[in-house]
Amino acid sequence: MRKAIFPGSFDPITLGHEDIIKRGIPLFDEIVIAIGVNAEKKYMFSLEERKRFIEETFKDEPKVSVITYEGLTIDLAKKQKAHFILRGLRNPADFEFEKAIAHTNRKLSKIETVFLLTAASTSFISSSIVRDVLRHGGEYEMLVPDAVRVKK
């Protein structure tokens, strides 16, 4: 079984995340969207809200499940018996950052990282940009799935 972990904080999930997941569905038998929890990080949306946004976005997709976790992604992948970590790349800076993590993960396990390039239409979107737009009362709706389109 080809099982992949798609990790992130998803604060909130964006159309870029959604695009990568949808394009990953034909590649894997199962995709586990793993919401990382970092006690030292301040989030705009609660863990419950972030999980609900993702579950609502993929409610009709049986190959997608959503979990939360603390600790190293590679440890979660092993625990979940996943052979792949799915990541999206928006730009060369993302690639350099993700490449170092992928090499480290490969040293620690047999788990492969699969990179998908973001679509040109979503490559400018990040959760931090969405949060900034929200904080300033801007129009954020075109950046996120329908499930997130609720003003804070």
Swiss-Prot record:
Keywords: ATP-binding, Coenzyme A biosynthesis, Cytoplasm, Magnesium, Nucleotide-binding, Nucleotidyltransferase, Transferase. This is Phosphopantetheine adenylyltransferase. Its main location: cytoplasm. Belongs to the bacterial CoaD family. Reversibly transfers an adenylyl group from ATP to 4'-phosphopantetheine, yielding dephospho-CoA (dPCoA) and pyrophosphate. Signal peptide: none annotated. Substrate binds at residues 9, 41, 73, 87. It is an enzyme of class 2 (transferase). The lineage of its organism: Bacteria, Pseudomonadati, Bacteroidota, Flavobacteriia, Flavobacteriales. The gene is coaD. PANTHER family: PHOSPHOPANTETHEINE ADENYLYLTRANSFERASE (PTHR21342:SF1).
